[in-house]
Swiss-Prot record:
Chief localization: secreted
Organism: Macaca fascicularis (Crab-eating macaque)
SUPFAM superfamilies per the UniProt record, alphabetical: (Trans)glycosidases, Galactose-binding domain-like
Signal peptide: 1-27
Keywords from the UniProt entry: Glycoprotein, Glycosidase, Hydrolase, Secreted, Signal
Protein name (record): Beta-galactosidase-1-like protein
InterPro entries found in the cross-reference section: B-gal_1-like, BetaGal1-like_ABD1, BetaGal_gal-bd, Galactose-bd-like_sf, Gly_Hdrlase_35_cat, Glycoside_Hdrlase_35, Glycoside_hydrolase_SF
């Protein structure tokens, strides 16, 4: 419920600071005191020590638990993004229900005595699909994202005219807990340097939210020139390995007076498929925080609880090559992906307690964990067997292949089909020119798996077939770019494939609704498919199993499997990529499972190769840094704590 009068939230906020005074209803304020380089909350000196938590990466039933642990850690504020694409899946269609209920999350934060620093974008990065921008923007292929392009501004205006009035009652001076709002996100790193765009956003925020709310920007030190704007308070972001004195000195060139603010102090870092799990040492993170607090700076720790990229929501980076972000967003944060306190949390709480009061009482204990299995999965059938169910509307036909965006397929998978126009007796090279596979293509001839083509890889497949042979290419969107100078990351086959010297034409595109099929699987009469002797290529496996007694959080381990997608009782857990790593387990919150003997169902879509024993197991610890080359007896004994490798800190990218 939104606050109706200023007094209703005031009592909740009293424990936030020793210096917080009892304000009258008309004196609630959060402002910059430039004369004394500090913030004032209701007229009293105030400094926030905040942490990032993304409601869209945490199931709603777990919000209160995570927020309570953040408050116990000594934080007096939280910071979070609002992903546009999470709330407006199609133009003019809005969703604020369930885990998308932003107002409910604001209320949970208030109940936990936490102020809010809101970052509504429109672009958020966050290692989230397309940086939070909806992919339907790309249905206008020439659109210039994050600029003053009229098409982009029209879409932004329409979205903010829905979003910002919803949060208006929650502004601090209106009785809510939102003390400040970020405009855009690290705009200086984008490269456009379009000040007209930033001025338009600032004007839109003021028109819809009024003059009292503090608006600010955040950039890495190299992005301050193009990311800051007069009238918006300038803040910076950096991690424990960076030179704090040098960066804050640079910040003073853009914001000579007022409090120093690090809006993203990195407690850890993200993971990419194919690279080591990133960690940051407890000593480095705590030392950096203490040094900033000694300067009187306000700090937000990114992340304090990372959560999970469920479903298809992970983003991607392009650092010389395309890098897809893992399903786990554990981030080596003070609160683990499963919501458990880590040694980093207790060390940070000790630092915070030197500068401000922290709540008394015991921290809620770690959630109970459980182990189940191993379970042997059963072959359901090849993906092609269910094509009529996966694409009930039938294919879209075109001479040349069309992108996901052109056929309104936002995420997931699309099947491309054509037929060989002549017999090919010898193995003949097959490829897609100009790096035109976005992002992975699983190639089949007459239903037989031939191999994979991957973005940024120059590999070719060698195909044979008779005239009229069916050529199927299942293309996977591995997540749109979420950071960098170009967010227009189109998916699918961007160029027509070539077989030998022949450009292939006459395509059928099947946008697949796999989640719908899995969710309602038990209602359907499934067609029979002849089981291949050695199953390979995109294939469904499943297993029903009971859990006797109560359930606990657990981690799904898929030893020997290659790459694919997993559903538990119809819920899309996300991607696994056992062969590439580093992530080897998927977090399964206990509320997804049925207890006391009720049947649960796990469904896998394995895209490449199945192990000789198609088994999975639920573990009581995560494995976030490993590869499938480790022996199973060894891999089960490892955890993220024992398999961590630090990497150089990067200044920005969130």
């Amino acid at each position: 419920m939104a606050p109706k009068k200023p007094s209703c939230l005031r009592s909740l906020l009293l424990p936030l600071s020793l210096t917080l005074l009892l304000p009258q209803a008309d004196t609630r304020s959060f402002i910059v005191d430039r004369d004394h380089d500090r913030f004032l909350l209701d007229g009293a000196p105030f400094r926030y020590v905040s942490g990032s938590l993304h409601y869209f990466r945490v199931p709603r039933v777990l919000w209160a638990d995570r927020l309570l642990k953040m408050r116990w850690s000594g934080l007096n504020a939280i910071q979070f993004y609002v992903p546009w694409n999470y709330h407006e899946p199609q133009p003019g269609v809005y969703n604020f229900n369930g885990s998308r209920d932003l107002i409910a999350f604001l209320n949970e934060a208030a109940l936990a005595n936490l102020l809010v620093i809101l970052r509504p974008g429109p672009y958020i990065c966050a290692e989230w699909e397309m940086g939070g921008l909806p992919s339907w923007l790309l249905r206008k292929p020439e659109i210039r994202l994050r600029t003053s392009d009229p098409d982009f501004l029209a879409a932004v205006d329409s979205w903010f005219k829905v979003l910002l009035p919803k949060i208006y009652p929650w502004l601090y001076h209106n009785g809510g807990n939102i003390i400040s709002i970020q405009v855009e996100n690290e705009y200086g790193s984008y490269g456009a340097c379009d000040f007209s765009y930033m001025r338009h956003l600032a004007g839109l925020f003021r028109a819809l939210l009024g003059e009292k709310i503090l608006l600010f920007t955040t950039d890495g030190p190299e992005g301050l020139k193009c990311g800051s704007l007069q009238g918006l308070y300038t803040t910076v972001d950096f991690g424990p390995a960076d030179n704090m004195t040098k960066i804050f000195t640079l910040l003073r060139k853009y914001e000579p007076h007022g409090p120093l603010v690090n809006s993203e102090y990195y407690t850890g870092w993200l993971d990419y498929w194919g690279q080591n799990h990133s960690t940051r040492s407890v000593s480095a993170v705590t030392k950096g925080l203490e040094n900033m607090l000694k300067l009187g700076a306000s700090v937000n720790m990114y992340m304090f609880h990372g959560g999970t990229n469920f479903g298809y929501w992970n983003g991607a980076d392009k650092k010389g090559r395309f890098l897809s972000i893992t399903t786990s967003y554990d981030y080596d944060a003070p609160i683990s992906e499963a919501g458990d306190p880590t040694p980093k949390l207790f060390a940070l709480r000790d630092v915070i307690s030197k500068f401000q009061e922290v709540p008394l009482g015991p921290l809620p204990p770690p959630s109970p964990k459980m182990m189940v299995g191993p379970l042997t999965l059963h072959l359901v059938g090849h993906l092609l067997a269910f094509l009529d169910l996966l694409c009930p509307s039938g294919p879209i036909r075109s001479i040349l292949p069309m992108t996901f965006e052109a056929v309104k397929q936002d995420r997931g998978f699309m099947l491309y089909r054509t037929y060989m126009t002549h017999t090919i007796f010898e193995p003949t090279p097959f490829w897609v020119p100009n790096n035109g596979v976005h992002d992975r293509a699983y190639v089949m001839v007459d239903g037989v798996f031939q191999g994979v083509l991957e973005r940024n890889m120059r590999d070719k497949l060698f195909l044979m077939g008779k005239v009229g042979s069916k050529l199927d290419i299942l293309v996977e969107n591995m997540g749109r770019l979420s950071f960098g100078s170009n967010s227009s990351d189109f998916k699918g086959l961007l160029e027509p494939p070539i077989l030998g010297q022949t450009i292939l034409t006459q395509w059928m595109m099947f946008p697949l609704k796999i989640d719908n099929l899995v969710k309602w699987w038990f209602l359907l009469q499934l067609p029979k498919w002849p089981y291949p002797q050695a199953p390979s290529g995109p294939t469904f496996y499943s297993k029903t199993f009971p859990i006797l007694g109560s359930v606990g959080d657990t981690f799904l381990h898929l030893p020997g499997w290659t790459k694919g997608q997993v559903w538990i009782n119809g819920f899309n857990l996300g991607r696994y990529w056992t062969k590439r790593g580093p992530q080897q387990t998927l977090y399964v919150p206990r509320f997804l499972l049925f207890p006391r003997g009720a049947l649960n169902k796990i469904t896998l879509l394995e895209l490449e190769n199945v192990p000789l024993q198609p088994q999975v197991q639920f573990l009581d610890k995560p494995i976030l840094n490993s590869t499938s080359t480790l022996h199973r007896t060894h891999i089960n004994s490892l955890s993220a704590d024992t398999l961590s490798a630090s990497e150089p800190m990067e200044l920005s990218g969130h």
